[in-house]
């Protein structure tokens, strides 16, 4: 029964004038269970014929059938399955993967055949023991002799059953004793029912075969059969057809990726560096943005929540505002009666010289306020008490200091009930309030007194500088601002004031800081792109370096999708490690920053960290795809020929 049928097969290489006719109208049938030696000098076409038989190459024309199935009609994946299920390759140079142990090399074809880990390792150990390599399962190829490596190669060929064993100069790299051992193994496999096809240029080695086919200049010139083929039953296990990716294939691809990264530590580190810098930059910038935003919003809370301050004039740049003085205490009283208003405080101010004992302080701001001022502005009383409504009505000469002023005037004394002089008027200190958070630190002192006292006894005016309004909690501040504007405009007969809404400021700052974070993150993202290009470059180099490995994997049954998966996982792994390292570096930087900085801290968010990991993974997919695709598109013969 013919297992291989070849009819009028031709193979050309090159194009045009450079075309070389390597195989010329080859027609040959090989029976199942035969031991065939294809002999010929270098350049005769014998290796090309074996490559076509092993589905590593395709004919230019003619017919090639295996078990009656026309190979010219098969897809790339179907040819890979055929190599996995039917063939076992024995190479002259062994072609073992140096990073794997003997057992792992033997078990490799079973991964692509879809066998479980336990099943393939058990069979690998069984085959190694059968071939006299018991105890060598964990040895790397570099720890084995040439003869031992070739026996590992034979065991690998038998892993999935090896119904057809293709041996390319199997003794070419061995001494005579080791070569004879290999030939004895091939004869034994033949007796067990395997179909053996051996390529050699040595007639003495070819003599071991039952049938000798001699090729010269691409043509069969002699075909000698010694004995009829015995139809011995082959009881070797055969690989089952498989599809898609199995868990074992993914795990093996992951392990090989880790091995490749470890094998080139410095190169891998330098490749990751671009990703590390990019991720560190993005995460740190977002953390800085979050921290500064929280600090600014915390400072804004010093203005009070749901508060609006009404000023004279049309805006902060209005030079006529001081002369206009349109706001009055009556305006404040009228606003206090509105349903959307919770509290109101008129404000007046003056600046001048403050005297305590034999000390004088030239830069002192006196703020005239109502009894509800500290509640409206969200300021905390630290010591003593606040101003009462009665004191406002009585023009009482009482005052409060902020904490900074207290430290300057009374560094070691209790300020309560002490008398200070301002504008030649005595003021009794009744309390201390927390410093306002909004704004930069100032060298000026701040004291607070009833606005009636400031107006009647200090400035001598009847107008006020501003009115601060606290809006009720259940009222929309934008609606309240519109209503307040309409009310005062009608009351004054014109709009001679402007309003500063604390919520509007907060929203503006949030928007601004968000825009700045986006801008700086975009700049940092560029370094990620550069890092991704570095990953792609190194992966292209890796594909070139490991071309031989790719050819071996394809020869033992790996599909293009398996090769694509292998290198894509490696690129993703490099980027993920780089991304995680970048996040850890950013957290370390943040920890150090937060220890030494007191104004604000770096605030890391879970979202930014998760986004960074996903981003680095995506970079690996995008920039790793092209090198992985290049690897998958390699021709098996070209890859195997690469040194």
Curated annotation (Swiss-Prot):
Segments traversing the membrane: 269-289, 523-543, 572-592, 603-623
Binding site for ATP: 40-47
Membrane topology: Multi-pass membrane protein
Domain ABC transporter, residue spans: 4-242
Keyword check for Transit peptide: no
CDD domains to which the protein is assigned, alphabetical: ABC_MJ0796_LolCDE_FtsE (cd03255)
A GO biological process held by the record: response to antibiotic
Major localisation: membrane
GO terms for cellular component: plasma membrane
EC numbers for this chain: 7.6.2.-
Record localization: Cell inner membrane
Swiss-Prot/TrEMBL keywords: Antibiotic resistance, ATP-binding, Cell inner membrane, Cell membrane, Membrane, Nucleotide-binding, Translocase, Transmembrane, Transmembrane helix, Transport
One GO molecular-function entry: ATP binding
InterPro entries given in the database record: AAA+_ATPase, ABC3_permease_C, ABC_transporter-like_ATP-bd, ABC_transporter-like_CS, MacB-like_ATP-bd, MacB_PCD, Macrolide_Exporter_MacB, P-loop_NTPase
PANTHER family attached to this UniProt entry: MACROLIDE EXPORT ATP-BINDING_PERMEASE PROTEIN MACB, MEMBRANE COMPONENT OF TRANSPORTER-RELATED
Known function: Part of the tripartite efflux system MacAB-TolC. MacB is a non-canonical ABC transporter that contains transmembrane domains (TMD), which form a pore in the inner membrane, and an ATP-binding domain (NBD), which is responsible for energy generation. Confers resistance against macrolides.
Family: Belongs to the ABC transporter superfamily. Macrolide exporter (TC 3.A.1.122) family.
Subunit structure: Homodimer. Part of the tripartite efflux system MacAB-TolC, which is composed of an inner membrane transporter, MacB, a periplasmic membrane fusion protein, MacA, and an outer membrane component, TolC. The complex forms a large protein conduit and can translocate molecules across both the inner and outer membranes. Interacts with MacA.
Protein name: Macrolide export ATP-binding/permease protein MacB
Upper lineage: Bacteria, Pseudomonadati, Pseudomonadota, Gammaproteobacteria, Pasteurellales
């Amino acid at each position: 029964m013919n297992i291989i049928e070849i009819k009028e097969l031709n193979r050309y290489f090159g194009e045009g004038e450079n075309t070389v006719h390597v195989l010329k109208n080859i027609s040959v049938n090989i029976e199942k269970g035969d031991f065939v030696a294809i002999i010929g000098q270098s350049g005769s076409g014998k290796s090309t014929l074996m490559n076509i038989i092993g589905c590593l190459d395709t004919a230019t024309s003619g017919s090639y059938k295996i078990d009656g199935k026309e190979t010219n009609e098969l897809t790339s994946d179907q040819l890979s399955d055929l190599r996995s299920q039917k063939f076992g390759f024995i190479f002259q140079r062994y072609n073992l993967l140096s990073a794997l142990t003997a057992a792992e090399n033997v078990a490799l074809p079973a991964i692509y055949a879809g066998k479980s880990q336990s099943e393939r390792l058990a069979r690998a150990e069984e085959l190694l023991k059968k071939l006299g390599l018991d105890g060598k399962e964990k040895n790397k190829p570099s720890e084995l002799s040439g003869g031992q490596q070739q026996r590992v190669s034979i065991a690998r060929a038998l892993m999935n059953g090896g119904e057809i064993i293709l041996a390319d100069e199997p003794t070419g790299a061995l001494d005579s004793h080791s070569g004879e051992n290999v030939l004895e193994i091939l004869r034994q496999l033949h007796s067990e029912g395997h179909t053996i096809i051996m390529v050699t240029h040595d007639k003495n080695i070819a003599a071991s075969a039952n049938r000798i086919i001699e090729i010269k200049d691409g043509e069969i010139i002699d075909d000698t059969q010694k004995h009829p083929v015995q139809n011995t039953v082959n009881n070797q296990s055969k690989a089952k057809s498989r599809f898609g990716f199995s868990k074992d294939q993914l795990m093996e691809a992951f392990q090989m990726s880790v091995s490749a990264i470890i094998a080139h530590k410095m190169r891998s580190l330098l490749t990751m560096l671009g990703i590390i810098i990019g991720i560190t930059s993005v995460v740190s910038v977002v953390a800085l943005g979050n921290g500064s935003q929280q600090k600014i919003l915390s400072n804004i809370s010093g203005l009070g929540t749901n508060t609006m301050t009404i000023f004279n004039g049309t805006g902060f740049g209005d030079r006529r505002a001081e002369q206009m003085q349109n706001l009055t205490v009556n305006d404040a009283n009228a606003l206090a009666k509105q349903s959307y208003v919770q509290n109101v405080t008129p404000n007046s101010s003056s600046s001048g010289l403050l005297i305590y004992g034999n000390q004088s302080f030239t830069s002192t701001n006196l703020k005239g306020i109502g009894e509800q001022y500290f509640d409206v502005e969200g300021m905390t009383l630290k010591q003593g008490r606040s101003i009462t409504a009665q004191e406002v009505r009585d023009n009482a000469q009482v005052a409060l200091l902020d904490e900074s002023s207290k430290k300057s005037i009374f560094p070691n004394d209790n300020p309560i009930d002490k008398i200070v002089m301002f504008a030649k008027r005595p003021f009794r200190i009744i309390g201390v309030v927390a410093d306002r958070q909004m704004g930069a630190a100032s060298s000026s002192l701040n004291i607070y007194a009833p606005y009636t006292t400031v107006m009647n006894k200090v400035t001598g005016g009847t107008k006020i500088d501003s009115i601060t309004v606290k809006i009720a909690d259940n009222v929309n501040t934008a609606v309240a601002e519109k209503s307040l504007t309409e009310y005062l405009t009608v009351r004054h007969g014109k709009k001679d004031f402007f309003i500063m809404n604390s919520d509007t400021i907060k929203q503006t700052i949030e928007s601004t800081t968000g825009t700045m974070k986006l801008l700086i993150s975009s700049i940092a993202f560029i370094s990620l792109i550069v890092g991704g290009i570095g990953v792609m470059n190194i992966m292209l180099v890796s594909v070139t370096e490991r071309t031989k490995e790719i050819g071996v994997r394809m020869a033992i049954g790996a599909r293009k999708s398996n090769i694509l998966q292998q290198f894509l996982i490696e690129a993703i792994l490099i980027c993920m490690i780089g991304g995680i390292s970048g996040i850890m570096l950013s957290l370390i930087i943040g920890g150090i920053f937060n220890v030494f900085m007191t104004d604000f801290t770096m605030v890391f968010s879970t979202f930014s960290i998760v986004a960074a990991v996903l981003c680095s993974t995506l970079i690996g997919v995008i920039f790793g795809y092209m090198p992985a695709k290049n690897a998958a598109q390699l021709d098996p013969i070209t890859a195997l020929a690469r040194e």
